[in-house]
């Protein structure tokens, strides 16, 4: 049994516009220097831009599907056994899946070239919805790495 105290989870307030915990977490993850209102306005306008590009569908359904397409199922963790370090594939918890998907989408949007962050983010969300783009490539690379190291699954802890 662990000697450490269990970490108390912070209560994430739901988003005011879409009444969604996931949208609120996404805005928090995008935030720089505590400027949440700027982060929220960028996110809302990029979701609206995304809805304009896909005019026939529900914008929140598109947002959630884009996140689901990026969520990784497995990842590799380093495990030291007898002087050698192995990359051991481990299944990812649901909360971490969400966090990684958000992180990868935001990182890909920031790295891409474009005029404004709302346009870059809406393009990356559209790419994620269509299972393309840099964030989807990151997920595929993670899955490929886990598949390549499948022989070391018995080192799981």
From Swiss-Prot:
The keyword rRNA-binding applies. GO terms for biological process: translation. The keyword Cytoplasm does not apply. InterPro entries: Ribosomal_uS7 (IPR000235), Ribosomal_uS7_bac/org-type (IPR005717), Ribosomal_uS7_CS (IPR020606), Ribosomal_uS7_dom (IPR023798), Ribosomal_uS7_dom_sf (IPR036823). One of its GO terms (molecular function) is structural constituent of ribosome. PROSITE patterns: RIBOSOMAL_S7. Keywords: Ribonucleoprotein, Ribosomal protein, RNA-binding, rRNA-binding, tRNA-binding. Signal peptide: none annotated. Pfam families: Ribosomal_S7. GO terms for cellular component: small ribosomal subunit. It comes from the Bacteria. HAMAP family: Ribosomal_uS7_B. Part of the 30S ribosomal subunit. Contacts proteins S9 and S11. One of the primary rRNA binding proteins, it binds directly to 16S rRNA where it nucleates assembly of the head domain of the 30S subunit. Is located at the subunit interface close to the decoding center, probably blocks exit of the E-site tRNA. PANTHER family: RIBOSOMAL PROTEIN S7. Belongs to the universal ribosomal protein uS7 family. This is Small ribosomal subunit protein uS7. It comes from Borrelia garinii subsp. bavariensis (strain ATCC BAA-2496 / DSM 23469 / PBi) (Borreliella bavariensis). The lineage of its organism: Bacteria, Pseudomonadati, Spirochaetota, Spirochaetia, Spirochaetales.
């Amino acid at each position: 049994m662990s000697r450490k105290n269990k970490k108390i989870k912070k209560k994430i307030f739901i988003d005011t516009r879409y009444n969604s915990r996931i949208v609120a977490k996404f805005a928090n993850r995008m935030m720089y220097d505590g400027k949440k209102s700027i982060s929220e306005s960028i996110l809302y306008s990029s979701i609206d831009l995304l809805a304009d590009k896909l005019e026939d569908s529900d914008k929140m359904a598109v947002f959630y599907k884009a996140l689901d397409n990026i969520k990784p199922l497995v990842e590799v963790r380093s495990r030291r056994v007898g002087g050698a370090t192995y990359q051991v594939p481990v299944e990812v918890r649901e909360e971490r899946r969400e966090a990684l998907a958000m992180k990868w989408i935001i990182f890909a949007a920031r790295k891409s070239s474009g005029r404004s962050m709302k346009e870059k983010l809406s393009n990356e969300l559209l790419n994620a919805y269509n299972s393309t783009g840099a964030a989807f490539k990151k997920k595929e690379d993670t899955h490929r790495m886990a598949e390549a190291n499948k022989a070391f699954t018995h080192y799981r802890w």
